[in-house]
Regions:
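Terminal targeting signals and extreme-terminal segments of soluble enzymes
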Residues: 1-137
Length: 137
């Protein structure tokens, strides 16, 4: 599987991931791992990482996970249809580490759980993303 600089499959890479600084470190059909180094432009006015960063990280990780699984199981594309992310701990610096795991992988939809932890393994955020499987064009 060829990948771009972020580690995402070339055919499913997103410039937005590079803008965030999201790097995929382990990609498989059964889940993936990724990391994101906190930069000043990811902070909200209170000096903590903006919640939208965690939503985006959860969505991107779930989308790549779902795509890789679908590619290996009949092909097609995926699009997110729901993202529910909980923010559990604020951080101001450091690196965040995400892990995705499948909850449901069906013919029409998939549901993925993504957990994000800090460098001390404390839970920062967790989210579920439901994705629609689209037929290959």
């Amino acid at each position: 599987m060829e990948s771009d600089a972020s580690g995402a499959p070339n055919e499913f890479s997103a410039p937005f991931d590079a803008t965030l600084g999201l790097v995929y470190t382990d990609v498989s059909p059964d889940g993936l791992k990724a990391q994101l180094t906190v930069k000043p432009d990811l902070l909200q006015p209170m000096g903590i990482v903006h919640g939208g960063v965690w939503c985006a990280m959860v969505e991107s990780m779930a989308s790549v996970s779902a795509y890789v699984w679908l590619r290996d199981n009949g092909g097609g594309n995926v699009v997110g249809v729901n993202n529910n992310t909980d923010f559990l701990r604020a951080i101001t610096e450091g690196t965040a580490y995400g892990v995705s795991e499948p909850v449901h992988r069906g013919r029409r939809q998939q549901l993925w759980l993504v957990t994000i932890r800090d460098e001390r393994q404390r839970l920062i955020a967790r989210g579920h993303v439901r994705l629609q499987n689209l037929e290959a064009q």
